[in-house]
């Protein structure tokens, strides 16, 4: 039943994703973060106090998320086993973001194909932190490919990894870790202190999933009739070409698979950030690379699901 729940949740994400107006735990987690952050800022003046308060915030948000998820599942199981199973499926479904990621990328791709640069910049600004107002088409292609490659890890592979380790409650706790990093894990002045713990713990949580993504995306590249060997080679060579210890693993693998170059300089919150280049520019990046990256994401996520199902069966002795 557990494996069936994983599969149904994955299929639901593949088919419908996260409908915009449906209730979603990540939105609730975001409200909790905003509430706790407001309290921390009120009572923790100065960088040192904010770093400590940010650590407390991380513990509170992640702990509450895990506890509520565990409690809701336990209560649902007591009401009826089938109800508990249904709640588990829903909870797992909400931790996966493959369809939402694909849809967001396609929302940028569509106006690009219609030569509507202004609209594509607006749609891109919804999913990236960089300044998109002056980006040219090739820069937009690069931003979308990087976003899909990076979020293949924290939107699909990592939730499945923590689902395998600790069930739906741990997968939900991971989403809290990831949401904390998304909201406060920045290096500029406003968040540097309060978000330090959140940023570092997100690095810890994604350490193994990011490295697993290198292998899965490399295999996916071969299955998609791209260069799997080049994906693995470039992914390994450029794995540290990023300020994050995790992001370049998936980005470099995708760059190698497609034969393009990612990374480079960008503007974040009014500040220029010079990132190392990732991959070799064997050809110029094109709008078609967006759909190719989405396909790589789906194949890699399918491989991840199959891997964790096989591992679960092996550990439980199920043939």
Swiss-Prot record:
The protein's topology relative to the membrane is: Multi-pass membrane protein
Q: Which family does it belong to?
A: Belongs to the CobD/CbiB family.
Function (record text): Converts cobyric acid to cobinamide by the addition of aminopropanol on the F carboxylic group. However, the true cosubstrate could be (R)-1-amino-2-propanol O-2-phosphate, leading to cobinamide phosphate.
* Top-level taxon in the UniProt lineage: Bacteria
- An MF annotation (GO) of this entry: ABC-type vitamin B12 transporter activity
GO terms of biological process kind:
cobalamin biosynthetic process
Instruction: Cite the entry's keywords alphabetically.
Output: Cell membrane, Cobalamin biosynthesis, Membrane, Transmembrane, Transmembrane helix
Q: In which pathway does it act?
A: Cofactor biosynthesis; adenosylcobalamin biosynthesis; adenosylcobalamin from cob(II)yrinate a,c-diamide: step 4/7
Q: Where in the cell is it found?
A: Cell membrane
Q: Name one GO cellular component term.
A: plasma membrane
Residues annotated as transmembrane: 52-74, 79-101, 155-177, 207-229, 296-318
- What's this protein's name? Cobalamin biosynthesis protein CbiB
Question: InterPro entries recorded for this chain?
Answer: Cobalamin_biosynth_CobD/CbiB (IPR004485)
């Amino acid at each position: 039943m557990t494996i069936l729940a994983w599969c149904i949740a994955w299929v639901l994400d593949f088919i419908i994703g996260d409908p915009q107006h449906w209730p979603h735990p990540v939105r609730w987690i975001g409200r909790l973060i905003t509430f706790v952050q407001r309290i921390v800022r009120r009572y923790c003046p100065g960088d040192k106090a904010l770093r400590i308060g940010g650590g407390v915030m991380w513990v509170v948000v992640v702990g509450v998320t895990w506890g509520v998820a565990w409690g809701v599942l336990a209560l649902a199981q007591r009401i009826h086993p089938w109800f508990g199973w249904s709640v588990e499926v829903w909870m797992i479904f909400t931790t996966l973001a493959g369809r939402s990621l694909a849809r967001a990328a396609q929302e940028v791709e569509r106006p690009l194909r219609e030569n509507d640069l202004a609209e594509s910049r607006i749609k891109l600004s919804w999913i990236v932190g960089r300044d998109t107002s002056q980006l040219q088409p090739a820069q937009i292609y690069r931003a979308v490919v990087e976003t899909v490659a990076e979020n293949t890890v924290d939107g699909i592979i990592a939730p499945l990894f923590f689902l395998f380790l600790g069930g739906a409650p741990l997968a939900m706790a991971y989403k809290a870790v990831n949401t904390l990093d998304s909201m406060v894990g920045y290096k500029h002045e406003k968040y540097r202190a309060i978000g330090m713990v959140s940023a570092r713990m997100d690095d810890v949580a994604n350490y193994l999933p990011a490295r697993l993504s290198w292998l899965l995306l490399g295999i996916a590249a071969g299955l998609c009739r791209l260069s799997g060997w080049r994906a693995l080679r470039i992914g390994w060579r450029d794995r540290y070409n990023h300020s994050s210890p995790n992001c370049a693993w998936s980005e470099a693998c995708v760059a190698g698979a497609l034969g393009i170059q990612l990374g480079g300089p960008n503007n974040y919150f009014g500040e220029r950030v010079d990132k190392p280049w990732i991959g070799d520019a064997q050809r110029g990046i094109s709008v078609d690379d967006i759909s190719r990256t989405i396909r790589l994401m789906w194949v890699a996520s399918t491989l991840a699901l199959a891997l964790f199902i096989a591992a679960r069966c092996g550990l439980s002795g199920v043939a």
